[in-house]
Amino acid sequence: MRIDQHSLKRRHVLSLACASAASIACPALAQNFPNKTITLVVPFPPGGTIDAAARALANQLSSLLGQSVVVDNRAGVRGSNGTSFVTRAPADGHSLLFSNLTPLAITPHMTADGNVINALAPIGTLAYGPQMLVSSKLNSVSDLRSMKPSLGHAGNGSLSHVLASLLSRSLGMRLDYKSYRGLAPLLNDMMGEQVGAAIVPVGAIVGLREPNSIKPLAITAPHKAMPGLPTFEQAGIGEATFNDWLGVLAPASTPASIVSRLNLTVNRIVQMNEVQDRLTSLGLMPQLSSPEQFGTLIKLYSNRMATVIRQEGIQIS
């Protein structure tokens, strides 16, 4: 299976430019920031897509801000551990969170951290991660209705678990779920035809040693990133559309001037060719935003996920 990484990047040039124009106006920048090492907390283990994107960001942040930027992986409880750590950090811009939407819009609805987003100040997005419906034995989305295969996911309370529930709702039928301890064992079993289908990040497929053994059936990206592959909407499963987002946040009381400076810096980084190339190689689509746009995005996704999690009774295992 071939991922057209040039198309992933090229189709977002215009949207990047438009979002950049919206981010130019800002308050006076903090003149004495940063004045020490910045810690970029990643609430997931080292080695994954989010960690790789964080390190690409950290390298450029250090160069542009003139201070060291250290990536600190604090995994646990679907991203809650690292996220909570940042909410308790000094609000001076030197402790930042780099995360996807899981600990911001999904996990809080299954833990006691239901208001975690109110304890954070969104700074801006780096990219979004389209999701892909894949299978090793189905040939089209219509086969889901006729064959009723099992749906794999990466563990109870995971993003792929929520997406499996969304897919069942979109199809109007209940499919059996098969839980795994992460995406790697799920995809290994799929290559052995031990599980029928799953919704996974495009980046998870990019990294496979034998990607041709898994067939893409549909993608959530709003524009076709792979020639001939339908979007979820085109395939009749639009309700399951979910694009994950990666972005930077700070403790809630961080001064607006520091948030503005960080937003402008992150937006500059997103527009660097070398960063865009790195992100697309990870199956991500570069996308910048204002702090307000990122905050609105998180709340929209959080409200949507809250409904699904409540109605489906999804819990963290």
Predicted regions and their residues:
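N-terminal secretory signal peptides
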Residues: M1-P27
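Immediate post-signal peptide segment of exported/extracytoplasmic ligand-binding proteins
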Residues: L29-L40, P90-H94, R145-S150, E210-P211, ...
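N-terminal (or domain-start) structured segment
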Residues: A30-A119, N156, G172-G196, L288, ...
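An extracytoplasmic/periplasmic, membrane-proximal ligand-sensing/linker region
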Residues: N35-T37, Q234, V259-S317
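Extracytoplasmic/secreted proteins, especially bacterial periplasmic and envelope-associated proteins
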Residues: A52, A56, N81, F85, ...
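Hinge/capping helix and adjacent helix->loop/strand transition within the periplasmic-binding protein
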Residues: R88-G93, P108-P185, F232, W245-R278
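Beta->alpha turn/N-cap motifs
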Residues: L97-P103, P108, G182-L183, V200-I205, ...
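Ligand-binding pocket segment of bilobal, Venus flytrap-like solute-binding proteins
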Residues: G152-P230
